[in-house]
């Protein structure tokens, strides 16, 4: 788990990801990490490494990146911030990340992404 994100939301470009993220991601995935959690930008984003990085052979192990939205109230005068949580589930076949956002009275499922585990 990282405070800063490895994966940024596509509409937020002023909050840069953690420094040297390509090297860090390679080391985390190389050490066997299958799920890397981050935050800091108050917006949810979920992706699997192989969707944006060409990896082959032993390096082709799945590695899901999940950036959590803020759990607290969005900051004043900040557009595009969500109040929400991520729920992670895993079994022998897949890692699933559910994004739940606050809808005024309760949290509701906004998105769900599932990624196959292991090598292709």
What is the predicted function of each stretch?
Residues 1, 36-38, 98:
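A structural signal for short, well-ordered beta-strand segments and their strand-loop junctions
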Residues 1-9:
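Short acidic, glycine-rich surface-loop motifs adjacent to enzyme active sites
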Residues 3, 70, 102:
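Cofactor-binding loop segments of dinucleotide-utilizing enzymes, especially the Rossmann-like FAD-
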Residues 10, 47, 78, 107-109, ...:
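Residue-level detector of solvent-exposed, low-hydrophobicity positions
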Residues 13-91:
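Conserved beta-sheet core of the metallophosphoesterase superfamily
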Residues 89-120:
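A short C-terminal boundary segment appended to hydrolase-like catalytic domains
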């Amino acid at each position: 788990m990282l405070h800063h994100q490895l994966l940024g939301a596509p509409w937020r470009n002023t909050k840069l990801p953690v420094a040297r993220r390509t090297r860090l991601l390679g080391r985390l995935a190389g050490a066997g990490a299958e799920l890397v959690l981050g935050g800091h930008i108050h917006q949810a984003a979920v992706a699997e490494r192989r969707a944006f990085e060409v990896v082959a052979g032993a390096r082709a192990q799945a590695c899901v990146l999940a950036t959590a939205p803020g759990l607290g109230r969005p900051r004043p005068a900040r557009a595009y911030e969500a109040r929400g949580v991520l729920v992670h589930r895993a079994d022998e076949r897949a890692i699933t990340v559910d994004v739940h956002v606050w809808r005024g009275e309760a949290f509701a499922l906004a998105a769900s992404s599932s990624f196959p585990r292991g090598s292709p």
